[in-house]
A protein has these predicted regions:
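Long, folded non-catalytic interaction modules
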Residues: 1-130
């Protein structure tokens, strides 16, 4: 966590909000979400955690879903901090348009919704079995 804190504290962004979407399906995921919330808060950020409902995530990396095509500056810091903590990450841009398109095509599609004030979300899935 020291390496993560170093990255987070060095960031000079004015907007230090981060949204953690936690899959409640496994105790390990819930524990990781709580630990990340603590590290972000100690690093001077404003984390908000939400439990994912309506779907079960497959095991995989920590995913950063960016609403627009261009990443806000905070995304790079968040990604570097997660990687400094030994986590594998994937980043996807243009998620808001993708979500809306999928919902239009299939109203029953279970995706991860983004609120208007969320430029990005960090999705914490169960870790793959090694």
């Amino acid at each position: 966590t020291d390496a993560m804190l170093e990255v987070l504290r060095a960031d000079t962004s004015t907007d230090k909000r981060v949204w953690l979407i936690v899959s409640p399906g496994s105790p390990e995921t819930v524990t990781l979400g709580a630990a990340l919330e603590t590290v972000f808060r100690e690093g001077g950020w404003q984390p908000t955690s939400q439990k994912l409902t309506g779907m079960v995530l497959k095991p995989g990396p920590v995913r950063i879903l960016v609403g627009e095509e261009l990443e806000p500056p905070a995304v790079d810091t968040v990604r570097r901090a997660l990687e400094a903590g030994g986590l594998t990450t994937e980043t996807g841009t243009g998620y808001r348009a993708f979500y809306e398109e999928r919902k239009r095509d299939n109203p029953n599609w279970a995706g991860i919704p983004m609120e208007a004030e969320q430029p990005f979300v960090v999705v914490i899935s169960p870790r793959p079995v090694a």
